[in-house]
Amino acid sequence: MTKSVYEFWISQGKDKLRLPVLPDQLSISNTVQNETVKVAKFGDLTFIDEQGAKEISFSSFFPKKYSPIAEYQNFPSPENAITKIEKWMKAKKPVQFLITGTKVNLTCSIEGFSYSEGQQDIGDRSFDIQLKEYKTASPRKIKQKKKTKAKRPSKAAPKTYTVKKGDTLWDIAGRFYGNSTQWRKIWNANKTAMIKRSKRNIRQPGHWIFPGQKLKIPQ
């Protein structure tokens, strides 16, 4: 009998089991966990989620003796094969399910395993097995942005104005502020220098300014 190009392997670490007899049928289901939400005026809205885990199921048997239906010789006894699978289940660790010649190579959990007296020969063990793709949740790393201290706006340096012949603080204020009544801002910013220049500014604040004199114009 011509042997199949496919080999079914189940392993956990270095402990491996190759199925002696290939199943007649292999079922692999793949679902998407979509969520449907009812929204007023819009009806049903479906949000497509990530692809769900694959589920694999098949049936076969562990032969007691070699026959042409077996894929290879010197396979483990039905008792040893069953013990191996049950040991993997008790370990609560995933197994690797591989089918050579295909793209099937999945890390799985054993969801169900049952066996019974075989229907071929005495000593054979028929079995059903259900596997589910095992996915680990990897936490996403979120980079936390460092808070930067807001820079306080620096005070703008006051402008300077060189007094011309005929200027008054009243006129200068009207020119820079559009409001001549703001002349006291210029006076307060230059009071010390103006009094130093002419003591008459004590009695008549801001009245005495001179051509060539530099005045600070505050913002």
Swiss-Prot record:
Residue intervals of the LysM domain: 159-217
Region: Disordered, residue numbers: 138-158
Origin species: Bacillus subtilis (strain 168)
Organism lineage: Bacteria, Bacillati, Bacillota, Bacilli, Bacillales
InterPro entries on file: Bact_Kbp, Dit-like_N, LysM_dom, LysM_dom_sf
PROSITE patterns from the UniProt entry: LYSM (PS51782)
Ranges annotated as biased composition (Basic residues): 138-154
The protein's name: Phage-like element PBSX protein XkdP
